[in-house]
Protein backbone atom coordinates (compact mmCIF):
# COMPACT_ATOMS: atom_id res chain seq x y z
CA UNK A 1 0.00 0.00 0.00
CA UNK A 2 1.36 3.37 -1.03
CA UNK A 3 0.05 6.86 -0.31
CA UNK A 4 0.71 10.42 -1.41
CA UNK A 5 -0.28 13.18 1.01
CA UNK A 6 -0.12 16.70 -0.36
CA UNK A 7 0.75 19.27 2.25
CA UNK A 8 1.94 16.35 4.35
CA UNK A 9 4.65 18.13 6.31
CA UNK A 10 2.50 19.97 8.85
CA UNK A 11 -0.80 20.10 10.66
CA UNK A 12 -3.49 17.65 9.50
CA UNK A 13 -1.39 16.53 6.55
CA UNK A 14 1.30 15.37 8.95
CA UNK A 15 -1.25 13.61 11.16
CA UNK A 16 -2.71 11.74 8.19
CA UNK A 17 0.71 10.78 6.82
CA UNK A 18 1.70 9.28 10.17
CA UNK A 19 -1.67 7.55 10.52
CA UNK A 20 -1.27 5.93 7.11
CA UNK A 21 2.22 4.76 8.01
CA UNK A 22 0.91 3.27 11.25
CA UNK A 23 -1.48 1.26 9.08
CA UNK A 24 1.36 -0.03 6.95
CA UNK A 25 1.38 2.42 4.04
CA UNK A 26 4.55 3.65 2.43
CA UNK A 27 4.08 7.42 2.19
CA UNK A 28 5.23 10.20 -0.11
CA UNK A 29 5.11 13.46 1.85
CA UNK A 30 4.57 16.45 -0.43
CA UNK A 31 5.63 19.92 0.66
CA UNK A 32 5.91 23.34 -0.97
CA UNK A 33 8.47 25.09 1.23
CA UNK A 34 8.56 23.23 4.57
CA UNK A 35 11.44 20.89 3.77
CA UNK A 36 12.67 20.50 7.34
CA UNK A 37 9.20 19.59 8.58
CA UNK A 38 8.70 17.16 5.69
CA UNK A 39 12.03 15.49 6.38
CA UNK A 40 11.04 15.11 10.03
CA UNK A 41 7.79 13.38 9.07
CA UNK A 42 9.69 11.10 6.70
CA UNK A 43 12.01 10.16 9.55
CA UNK A 44 9.07 9.27 11.78
CA UNK A 45 7.50 7.14 9.04
CA UNK A 46 10.73 5.28 8.38
CA UNK A 47 11.04 4.62 12.10
CA UNK A 48 7.73 2.75 11.80
CA UNK A 49 9.30 0.46 9.21
CA UNK A 50 7.68 2.00 6.12
CA UNK A 51 9.17 3.62 3.07
CA UNK A 52 8.88 7.40 2.92
CA UNK A 53 10.07 10.22 0.72
CA UNK A 54 9.69 13.98 0.90
CA UNK A 55 8.69 15.45 -2.47
CA UNK A 56 8.75 19.20 -3.21
CA UNK A 57 6.27 20.73 -5.64
CA UNK A 58 4.65 24.11 -6.14
CA UNK A 59 1.01 23.26 -6.83
CA UNK A 60 0.50 26.65 -8.46
CA UNK A 61 2.76 25.52 -11.31
CA UNK A 62 1.23 23.12 -13.83
CA UNK A 63 4.42 21.20 -14.63
CA UNK A 64 5.08 20.55 -10.95
CA UNK A 65 1.48 19.38 -10.43
CA UNK A 66 1.87 16.99 -13.35
CA UNK A 67 5.15 15.58 -12.07
CA UNK A 68 4.18 14.91 -8.48
CA UNK A 69 2.26 11.63 -8.88
CA UNK A 70 4.92 9.98 -11.10
CA UNK A 71 7.60 11.09 -8.63
CA UNK A 72 5.66 9.51 -5.76
CA UNK A 73 5.20 6.22 -7.62
CA UNK A 74 8.89 6.10 -8.46
CA UNK A 75 9.99 6.95 -4.92
CA UNK A 76 7.74 4.33 -3.33
CA UNK A 77 8.43 1.60 -5.87
CA UNK A 78 4.99 1.12 -7.39
CA UNK A 79 1.54 2.57 -8.02
CA UNK A 80 0.14 4.92 -5.40
CA UNK A 81 -3.07 3.42 -4.00
CA UNK A 82 -4.20 6.26 -1.72
CA UNK A 83 -4.17 9.96 -2.61
CA UNK A 84 -4.87 12.60 0.02
CA UNK A 85 -5.52 16.00 -1.59
CA UNK A 86 -4.80 18.05 1.50
CA UNK A 87 -2.59 20.97 0.39
CA UNK A 88 -4.56 24.19 0.35
CA UNK A 89 -4.29 27.96 0.17
CA UNK A 90 -6.63 29.66 2.64
CA UNK A 91 -6.52 33.44 2.35
CA UNK A 92 -9.20 35.98 3.03
CA UNK A 93 -11.17 37.76 0.35
CA UNK A 94 -14.81 38.51 -0.37
CA UNK A 95 -16.83 39.47 -3.43
CA UNK A 96 -15.68 43.09 -3.14
CA UNK A 97 -11.98 42.52 -2.46
CA UNK A 98 -11.21 39.41 -4.54
CA UNK A 99 -8.64 39.92 -7.30
CA UNK A 100 -7.61 37.84 -10.28
CA UNK A 101 -4.55 36.80 -8.28
CA UNK A 102 -6.51 35.71 -5.19
CA UNK A 103 -8.98 33.85 -7.41
CA UNK A 104 -6.26 32.06 -9.37
CA UNK A 105 -4.26 31.09 -6.28
CA UNK A 106 -7.27 29.48 -4.63
CA UNK A 107 -8.48 27.76 -7.79
CA UNK A 108 -5.07 26.36 -8.68
CA UNK A 109 -4.24 24.99 -5.23
CA UNK A 110 -7.69 23.89 -4.09
CA UNK A 111 -9.22 22.66 -7.35
CA UNK A 112 -6.87 22.43 -10.32
CA UNK A 113 -4.13 20.57 -8.43
CA UNK A 114 -6.51 17.92 -7.01
CA UNK A 115 -7.99 17.48 -10.50
CA UNK A 116 -4.58 16.95 -12.11
CA UNK A 117 -3.47 14.58 -9.34
CA UNK A 118 -6.72 12.64 -9.63
CA UNK A 119 -6.13 12.17 -13.35
CA UNK A 120 -2.59 10.94 -12.77
CA UNK A 121 -3.66 8.71 -9.90
CA UNK A 122 -6.33 6.96 -11.94
CA UNK A 123 -4.00 6.46 -14.90
CA UNK A 124 -1.34 4.59 -12.89
CA UNK A 125 -3.66 2.44 -10.80
CA UNK A 126 -4.41 -1.25 -11.44
CA UNK A 127 -7.99 -2.11 -12.35
CA UNK A 128 -10.43 -3.27 -9.68
CA UNK A 129 -10.10 -6.82 -8.41
CA UNK A 130 -13.00 -9.02 -7.33
CA UNK A 131 -13.99 -10.39 -3.94
CA UNK A 132 -15.46 -13.75 -2.94
CA UNK A 133 -18.82 -12.67 -4.33
CA UNK A 134 -17.18 -11.87 -7.68
CA UNK A 135 -17.92 -8.18 -7.11
CA UNK A 136 -15.32 -5.48 -7.82
CA UNK A 137 -13.14 -4.01 -5.08
CA UNK A 138 -11.66 -0.61 -5.90
CA UNK A 139 -7.87 -0.62 -5.81
CA UNK A 140 -7.58 3.09 -5.16
CA UNK A 141 -8.90 5.64 -2.67
CA UNK A 142 -8.85 9.41 -3.03
CA UNK A 143 -9.63 11.66 -0.07
CA UNK A 144 -10.24 15.33 -0.80
CA UNK A 145 -9.91 17.60 2.20
CA UNK A 146 -12.70 20.11 1.77
CA UNK A 147 -14.27 22.26 4.50
CA UNK A 148 -17.52 22.28 6.40
CA UNK A 149 -18.08 25.69 4.75
CA UNK A 150 -19.48 23.94 1.68
CA UNK A 151 -22.41 22.82 3.86
CA UNK A 152 -22.96 26.26 5.41
CA UNK A 153 -22.16 29.01 2.97
CA UNK A 154 -21.14 32.52 4.03
CA UNK A 155 -19.84 35.48 1.99
CA UNK A 156 -16.46 35.29 3.73
CA UNK A 157 -13.33 33.72 2.15
CA UNK A 158 -15.08 33.90 -1.22
CA UNK A 159 -12.44 32.51 -3.60
CA UNK A 160 -11.49 29.76 -1.16
CA UNK A 161 -15.11 28.72 -0.59
CA UNK A 162 -15.94 28.65 -4.30
CA UNK A 163 -12.85 26.53 -4.98
CA UNK A 164 -13.81 24.09 -2.22
CA UNK A 165 -17.34 23.91 -3.61
CA UNK A 166 -15.75 22.93 -6.90
CA UNK A 167 -13.67 20.29 -5.12
CA UNK A 168 -16.85 18.85 -3.61
CA UNK A 169 -18.35 18.64 -7.12
CA UNK A 170 -15.12 17.02 -8.31
CA UNK A 171 -15.39 14.47 -5.50
CA UNK A 172 -18.86 13.42 -6.60
CA UNK A 173 -18.26 13.40 -10.35
CA UNK A 174 -14.98 11.49 -10.11
CA UNK A 175 -16.62 9.01 -7.73
CA UNK A 176 -19.00 8.36 -10.62
CA UNK A 177 -16.48 8.50 -13.43
CA UNK A 178 -13.71 6.41 -11.85
CA UNK A 179 -15.91 3.67 -10.39
CA UNK A 180 -15.48 0.79 -9.78
CA UNK A 181 -11.69 1.12 -9.85
CA UNK A 182 -11.33 4.16 -7.57
CA UNK A 183 -13.37 5.38 -4.61
CA UNK A 184 -13.44 9.13 -4.02
CA UNK A 185 -14.57 10.68 -0.74
CA UNK A 186 -14.09 13.90 1.20
CA UNK A 187 -13.52 15.06 4.76
CA UNK A 188 -14.76 18.48 5.92
CA UNK A 189 -12.87 19.53 9.05
CA UNK A 190 -14.21 22.19 11.35
CA UNK A 191 -12.14 23.92 14.06
CA UNK A 192 -9.41 21.35 14.70
CA UNK A 193 -6.06 23.15 14.93
CA UNK A 194 -5.46 26.80 15.76
CA UNK A 195 -4.81 28.80 12.60
CA UNK A 196 -1.49 30.54 12.03
CA UNK A 197 -3.21 33.95 12.00
CA UNK A 198 -5.78 33.10 14.67
CA UNK A 199 -5.61 34.04 18.34
CA UNK A 200 -6.06 31.32 20.93
CA UNK A 201 -9.10 33.17 22.27
CA UNK A 202 -10.78 33.19 18.86
CA UNK A 203 -9.95 29.52 18.27
CA UNK A 204 -11.44 28.48 21.61
CA UNK A 205 -14.55 30.55 20.94
CA UNK A 206 -14.90 28.99 17.49
CA UNK A 207 -14.79 25.49 18.97
CA UNK A 208 -17.28 26.40 21.70
CA UNK A 209 -19.75 27.86 19.20
CA UNK A 210 -20.39 24.55 17.43
CA UNK A 211 -23.55 22.51 17.98
CA UNK A 212 -21.63 20.09 20.21
CA UNK A 213 -19.79 23.01 21.90
CA UNK A 214 -16.52 21.33 20.97
CA UNK A 215 -14.30 21.13 17.94
CA UNK A 216 -12.50 18.17 16.47
CA UNK A 217 -9.12 16.75 17.37
CA UNK A 218 -6.61 15.44 14.80
CA UNK A 219 -7.50 11.90 15.89
CA UNK A 220 -11.09 12.56 14.80
CA UNK A 221 -9.84 13.44 11.31
CA UNK A 222 -7.67 10.34 11.06
CA UNK A 223 -10.60 8.25 12.32
CA UNK A 224 -12.63 9.57 9.39
CA UNK A 225 -9.79 8.63 7.06
CA UNK A 226 -9.73 5.17 8.60
CA UNK A 227 -13.46 4.78 8.07
CA UNK A 228 -13.11 5.51 4.36
CA UNK A 229 -10.16 3.12 4.04
CA UNK A 230 -12.17 0.35 5.68
CA UNK A 231 -15.43 0.93 3.77
CA UNK A 232 -15.23 -0.55 0.26
CA UNK A 233 -18.90 0.23 -0.45
CA UNK A 234 -18.60 3.98 0.28
CA UNK A 235 -17.84 6.55 -2.41
CA UNK A 236 -18.85 10.11 -3.27
CA UNK A 237 -19.39 11.10 0.37
CA UNK A 238 -18.44 14.14 2.44
CA UNK A 239 -17.96 13.52 6.16
CA UNK A 240 -17.96 16.77 8.16
CA UNK A 241 -15.85 16.34 11.29
CA UNK A 242 -16.66 19.67 12.86
CA UNK A 243 -18.60 19.36 16.10
CA UNK A 244 -21.73 20.07 14.08
CA UNK A 245 -20.46 23.49 13.00
CA UNK A 246 -22.20 23.15 9.63
CA UNK A 247 -25.53 22.71 11.48
CA UNK A 248 -25.25 25.92 13.51
CA UNK A 249 -28.75 27.35 13.96
CA UNK A 250 -28.59 29.77 16.90
CA UNK A 251 -28.75 32.91 14.77
CA UNK A 252 -30.09 36.23 16.12
CA UNK A 253 -33.50 35.77 14.47
CA UNK A 254 -33.99 32.41 16.20
CA UNK A 255 -32.75 33.64 19.57
CA UNK A 256 -34.84 36.82 19.43
CA UNK A 257 -31.78 39.07 19.50
CA UNK A 258 -32.07 42.30 17.54
Predicted region positions:
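Canonical Rossmann dinucleotide-binding motif of NAD(H)/NADP(H)-dependent dehydrogenases/reductases
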Residues: 1-28
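Conserved NAD(P)H cofactor-binding loop of Rossmann-fold oxidoreductase domains
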Residues: 86-92, 244
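Substrate-binding pocket helix/loop in short-chain dehydrogenase/reductase
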Residues: 94-95, 99-107, 206
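A short, exposed helix-loop element centered on a Lys and neighboring polar residues
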Residues: 118-119, 172
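Catalytic loop of short-chain dehydrogenase/reductase
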Residues: 129-179, 191, 245
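Conserved Rossmann-fold SDR core element
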Residues: 168, 178-192, 234-241
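C-terminal substrate-recognition "lid" of short-chain dehydrogenase/reductases
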Residues: 217-241, 246-247
Amino acid sequence: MRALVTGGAKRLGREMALYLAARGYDVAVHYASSQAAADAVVGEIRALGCKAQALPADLLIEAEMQGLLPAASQALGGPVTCLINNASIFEYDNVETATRNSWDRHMESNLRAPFVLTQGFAAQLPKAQTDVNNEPIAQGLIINMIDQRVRKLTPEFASYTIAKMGLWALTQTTAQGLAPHVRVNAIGPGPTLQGARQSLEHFQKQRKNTVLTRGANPSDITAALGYFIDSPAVTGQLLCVDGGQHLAWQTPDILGIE
